[in-house]
Amino acid sequence: MSQILTGRQAEELHKSLIAYLSSINASQSVTTLREELQIGDNFTDAACKKYEGFLEKKWISVVRLQKRILDLESKIASLQAELDSAPTITSRANRDPKSWLPGTSPTHTLGSHRGAITCVAFHPVFSSLASGSEDYSIKIWDWELGELERTLKGHTRTVTGLDFGGQKGRTLLASCSNDLTIKLWDPSNDYANIRTLFGHDHSVSSVRFLIPGGNILISASRDTTLRMWDTSTGFCVKTIHTQGDWVRDVFPSFDGKWLVSGGRDQAATIWEVSSGEARASLLGHENYIECCTFAPPSSYGYLATLAGLKKPPSTNSSAEFVATGARDKTVKLWDSRGSLIKTLIGHNNWVRGLVFHPGGKYLFSVGDDKTIRCWDLSQEGKLVKTLEGAHEHFVSCIQWAPDPANLVQSSVAERPEGNKGTEHGTTGFRCVIATGSADSCVRVFM
């Protein structure tokens, strides 16, 4: 008798072996096994039928359990590594915000939408967070309290993009949609829809204010154009014909002098705002580009090292480095000339959103693999943290809460040339991110 199994368990195993051999017509082996195990004729064919499939089920269960054990061991190792690198209790209160990474559990899960979340945006001053959805609505939340404040209705198709901006003391919320329109909402007047902008000939994919304190709005569309709008008049003041395909995303440099766009043609392009001309094409992705962003000056030192530069660019210069995410499951880092610096591999599905840590050391990405991934630029873009199951479905967007003090950057173009670049080196900021998902929820990590 086995030293591991009890007498009853051993008997069950022996009968299962006989049942399995009988099912594959190994009659000689059955006879031999009956003799060896002293199982007589009282174990009839009818009784044998009860044990058919028992051994196979046990085998499959063992394989599944082994896989589950390996997965759990991997997660334990990852969590242990995270724990080992975490600050001690005594130092946590004095932790440098530049090293902040989101915890595994969200502070708030905001649920009210009836469709997938496509975009989120933070108010630049107040604790308000806007979310857009495939249910055609925009919802305004208090991200500190985790409460719904109001629902905005007006679009007749999926809301695809959101951004807060506008002149000082006159913050507006801009939204864009597959209904071909851009709408402006006034937070100071109960988010009244004060203007609707018409001009695009197809779905509007993305909308951004050119600079935080300005009145120029940038939009990207499936009609292959980028348009600039004066929000004070509602007029389109410039159109850039990309000569490409569906433009999925657009992002301005911090000084409003440059744009980066990306889309279905698998290329990202850096544009000069004043002339509307392309400065560089970033070629290398093998599928649609879903998201693109300029690196903040606080990242220049890390990215310059990755690029092999002897010294980083001045923090007064803009559009020096770009990050893109695509349906080819990769994140790519580029310099302003269009040279590929690094490809970050880790996602196992489409990459849908990117945001740089204000401290400059990290880049966060989200994707259809339901994860938030944190890449350490000081370690050559090493993946240092993965929030598995950040949502229950595809993670479609991510945003970092802006620091109200950084609104002074909007006047950067008016600064004297002699001003030092430390004005862009963020020393204090709010450690808050928000993500949206196809599970119809927004999650806030603090």
From Swiss-Prot:
Primary location group: cytoplasm
Subcellular location(s) of the protein: Cytoplasm, Cytoskeleton; Cytoplasm, Cytoskeleton, Spindle pole
Domain LisH: 9-41
Biological processes annotated in GO: cell division; establishment of mitotic spindle orientation; microtubule sliding
Coiled-coil residue spans: 60-86
Annotated WD repeat ranges: 112-153, 155-195, 199-239, 242-281, 284-344, 346-385, 390-430, 432-446
A single Gene Ontology CC term: microtubule
GO molecular function annotation: dynein complex binding
Keyword terms: Cell cycle, Cell division, Coiled coil, Cytoplasm, Cytoskeleton, Microtubule, Mitosis, Repeat, Transport, WD repeat
Top-rank taxon, per record: Eukaryota
A Pfam cross-reference name: LisH_PAC1
Domain-level remarks: Dimerization mediated by the LisH domain may be required to activate dynein.
Role, per record: Positively regulates the activity of the minus-end directed microtubule motor protein dynein. May enhance dynein-mediated microtubule sliding by targeting dynein to the microtubule plus end. Required for nuclear migration during vegetative growth as well as development. Required for retrograde early endosome (EE) transport from the hyphal tip. Required for localization of dynein to the mitotic spindle poles. Recruits additional proteins to the dynein complex at SPBs.
HAMAP family (alphabetical): lis1
Family: Belongs to the WD repeat LIS1/nudF family.
Known partners and oligomeric status: Self-associates. Interacts with NDL1 and dynein.
Alphabetical list of PANTHER family matching this protein: TRANSCRIPTION INITIATION FACTOR TFIID, TRANSCRIPTION INITIATION FACTOR TFIID SUBUNIT 5
Name under which the protein is recorded: Nuclear distribution protein PAC1-1
